[in-house]
Amino acid sequence: PREGAEDRASFQNFSFNFDSASGIIYTVDVTKPQGEKITITSMADGSPFRMDKIYKVALNSYRGNGGGELLTKGSGIPQEDLKDRIIFSTDKDLRFYLMNYIEKKGTMNPKALNQWKFVPEKWTVPAAQRDSEYLFRSVQ
């Protein structure tokens, strides 16, 4: 939470601005400075991740249009250039396609991909446990 905040809704950063990626193996090192925290180890299939290669990435419209400043401040892409990077867009939102998929498939059994982690774990595991207790404690 923000310094001095008493309630669970007072976090400095909103949870919807924390993304995770699928298809790559990576670590987030909380000891490194901003802009240097993420290290991509490989593609999820074990093939090398190459910084000199251009990859196609699926994003929701919020992110693709600059929401959360991940692409603008995080990647240094000017806001006015974002629309030129979109190569495909749907006419419906992600919820529509997710609901449609669930209706067709029926019961789903989601599983964690375990393709990323925070390090050093001696700091991050206790912090995650503490945060979970704080966020999901019983309302009295």
Predicted regions and their residues:
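Catalytic centers of hydrolytic enzymes
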Residues: 1-140
